[in-house]
Amino acid sequence: MLTNFVVDVLRGFGLDFGFQTEFVEEGKVRFVVPMLETYKISLREYVPSGAPVFYNPIMEFNRDIAVLVLQAYQKSLGREVRVCEPLTGCGVRGIRFAAEIEGVKEVVINDISREAAKLAHFNVEQNNMTNLVSVVNEDANLLLNRYAAPRKRFDYVDVDPFGSPVLYIDSAVRALRDGGLLALTATDMAPLCGVYPKACVRKYGGKPLRTEYCHEIAVRLLAGCLATTAARHEMGIKVLFSHSTNHYIRLYAQVNYGAKQADNSIQKMGYILHCFACF
């Protein structure tokens, strides 16, 4: 928890956030977040969506993997990369990219919440990353669309929403350069695992199955949604890595330009046949 002295310092810089805060360390960065204890509903359960600025400590593993994937991708390119995180919350993911990955040229982090953008900007300054990280306060799709023009596109876009990423996929693929890497998180596992199948069909364009391997199906539904969305822009995808962890699924896919690439992605889509009488 912040001491009274630190709170006074924050106020002196015009950074009285209007809610209780505390310092957290993750990876190589130290940053301010809403006080987690305030939003606990039990000894083990924390509700990040109830906080004025989003931060989920359970997703640290997600961010750890993202750092490793982006570093490997940057090394495979052999040049500096430009990164965008359009739904940043407190800013920790984007700041970690800048602080922990060699070869990052620029990181643009954004949140539509003024409180989140304000806190993220403070965290960028606290970690001495203002030379690499810029903070934007606008709608995520508007931000991504502004970078959809040639020579403005990113090498890596990380979409990590609270819920489904489908609302941002169209803008995200357009904001990526040829061969760029798109990372998607989906936490709406109830539709994806068949509890609400109609919602899944509406969002992802596929029907889920309530089976013991429903999380694998969820990843494939997300990949299929990405493939069809990218194909509308004559882009194909190549899934490089995915995982299902705790309450979410995660997908990393390379986006390649060209109608042939799009056709190849669509041809890889198919159907799963499952007999509930046999299994």
Annotate each PLM feature.
Residues 1-279:
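SAM-dependent transferase fold signal centered on methyltransferase-like domains
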